[in-house]
Every structure is written in structure tokens, then in C-alpha cells.
């Protein structure tokens, strides 16, 4: 009788342990993500203000390609974005409106005190590319009240003190391109500013707004911003006047490097490039 009781007890324990094991396996299976489902990723992208409309549209498209990725954008002047990155702001991918700001983070230029004065090495090796090309344009408010037709005419009007021009600050790429145009025409920016014919914007969007609101007679902005704002472009600067307008992009060290590279690769696809080209960008790679 004792043997039978012991046998029943052993059988009960075996069944109990089996049931517990099955329950644990079911719980573990429920906790595991479905096969092929990628882990959620938040990707922080710092990009020039002139890319606001295009990258916002591309972000919606990218959801289909990478539904696990949440894109967070920080748009602003490239100079401001550079400063934020240098000060330790979280950033996975940087897209600048000029090479100057990207050079300041490029470790391959660490020995070049002019291009990388602080000797920083913050870019993932091999990730830097020239992504896009833009154009510097002369845009006017609706109706073109001042009758401005070209950069040649603008130079004369500035010299005469008979025009009011909006341009970017000196730490903003669009402002730096404008300074090159001044140099091309032999104009003294300091003298022009003192005479009251210039007003400044902290980024290209601010300059564009001044033109859109007819607060100025004209403004020097990118072709893409003029298109997005529905402004009339009366002239475009040649490379001889201000050089090429190249937008470099690179993955920043220490963040979500793999996901950032994947998004940068996507920006070079036909689907993404169609969005860029629709507003006036062209591929630079």
C-alpha cells in the first residue's frame, strides 16, 4: 500500500513539473518578438533647415521600408547644428548645407587646422558622402516691386544704397555663399551693413520668410526654399560666383550607427531622390 502511495505521489509531481514547464515555455514564447520583427530604434537626424520639407516627406516613405525606426529631426542652420554636436547633443546622422561644418567633425582632416580647427574625429569612417547639390538664387516678393532682374543689377543697387536685401548670418551656409557673391562683385559687406541696405536671418528659412512677407526687396536663398515658398527666382548664382552648393552627410560616432547608415543609404535611392529632385535638389554622389 505504501508503494502504491509513493507511486501516485511521484506521478503527481511529474505531471505538475511538466505543466509548469509548458506554462514557462508559453510565457517565454509570448515575450519573444515575432520572427523577423526588428527592435524599435529612435534615430536622431540633424539636418540643414533647407531640407525641412523634403526630409519630412521622406520620413513618411521610410516608415514602409523600416517600420521599427522612429525618425526625430532637428532642423536648423548648419552652424548651429555643428555647435550642438560639438557640445554633445545626441545625433546619429548629420546633413549640412556646406562642407565647412562637416569638415569640422571629420577626423581625416584632423591635421588641417583651417578645416578642422579643434581636431575632432566624430564621423564614422567611410560614412561621409556628398549627398545633394542645391543652387543659390536671388528671390523677390510677389510682384517684384523693385523690378530686380539679376545679381548684376543687385550689385549696382547695393552700391547705390537703393535696395534692401535679406541674407543669412555669417555662420549660416547661405550667408557664407552670399558673402562670396559680394566678394565676386567687389562689395564690402561691412560698409553695406552700415549703410542699412542689409538685414540678416539666423537660417535660410528666416531669410525666405522676410522675402515672402515683402519685408525686403529681395533675398539670397536656395532654389529649393524659393520653390517651397512659391517665390519668384530672378537669377541663379554660378559656381564662379560662390562655388558649388554641396550638402554632405555622415553618420556620427557613438549613436545608432547601423540604423543611421541604413537611412543614409535610403536617402540615395531613386524613391528618396525623386522627392529631393521635385523641389530642385540634384544628386551629388
Per-segment meaning from a language model:
Residues 105-127, 226-237:
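Ligand-binding "clamshell"
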Residues 88-89, 214:
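Active-site charged/polar residues at nucleotide-handling catalytic sites that mediate phosphoryl
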Residues 21-60, 64, 79, 98-99, ...:
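Exported/periplasmic ABC-transporter solute-binding proteins
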Residues 75-83, 90-110:
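Ligand-binding clamshell of periplasmic/extracellular solute-binding protein-like
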Residues 66-73:
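A generic structural motif
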Residues 15-19:
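C-terminal motif of bacterial Sec signal peptides marking the signal peptidase cleavage site
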Residues 1-10:
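Positively charged n-region of N-terminal signal peptides that target proteins for export
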